[in-house]
Amino acid sequence: DDCIVVEYYIVTDSAFTKRFKSNSALTKYVTVMFTGVQNLMDTLELGIGVRLLGVTAFNEETEPSFIIDNLISGPPEAFDPDVLITAMSEYYCNHQIGLAKNTDLIFLITARGMGDPREDGTVDINTAGIANSAGVYKPCLKAGVATDDSDYNERVDTLAHESVHLLGSPHDGEGPDQVSLEGSPGAANCPAKAGYIMGNRNDKNKYKFSPCTKKCVEYLLSKPAASCIFEQCSGF
């Protein structure tokens, strides 16, 4: 029997990396996040497992061009999310080696903020994460970004929310035109106010995905191109 396993490769920017005393402390922290992501994915009831393949913690000397070249000095230092996701996607499109090549999804975790640049050089910090729609099995579109503000629930939600964009779901209340996958059912039938993870989260439903999100992800998984997410079941 086949199992659905979404594999992740995590890279961290220098601002995030320097919060930790050691690489092992950072890796442990990220691993704990994935326990939370798995718990949220379980609410899709599609049997999706998440697996962390590895973590690369960049420091100020090793940060790649897609981070350095797009940093807005602020203060505080921040990114324009649209510019960052485009540059990151292109970078990994051109650097398909090792874990970056083998993984289903690549996420940057940043401790810097994201938002709209203002004319005075500062940034209106208003974006927790961004990801390419239905990009999971496309080598040049399998990227996402999540900001980490040290609140466990917030960052786990962001990672799960952005992952599900990559797995073919729009926000609740959005139609199929918001999904980069032909034939997607979209999520227009699930209003944002119902309060699920892909809507405006309320206390009742903020740790669950809506029925529409489930249908959208199920649709993506039914496509032949999604076969890379399926593997032989082991004692996973």
From Swiss-Prot:
UniProt-annotated binding residues for Zn(2+): H161, H165, H171
Active-site residues, Swiss-Prot/TrEMBL: E162
GO cellular component: extracellular region
Keywords: Calcium, Disulfide bond, Hydrolase, Metal-binding, Metalloprotease, Protease, Secreted, Toxin, Zinc
Pfam families membership: Reprolysin_5
Occurrences of domain Peptidase M12B (ranges): 4-232
Domain of life (superkingdom): Eukaryota
Protein family according to the UniProt entry: Belongs to the venom metalloproteinase (M12B) family.
Role, per record: Acts as a metalloprotease. Penetrates intact tissue and specifically cleaves the vesicle-associated membrane protein 2 (VAMP2) (part of the SNARE complex) involved in pancreatic secretion, thus disrupting the normal vesicular traffic.
Protein name as annotated: Venom metalloproteinase antarease-like TfasMP_A
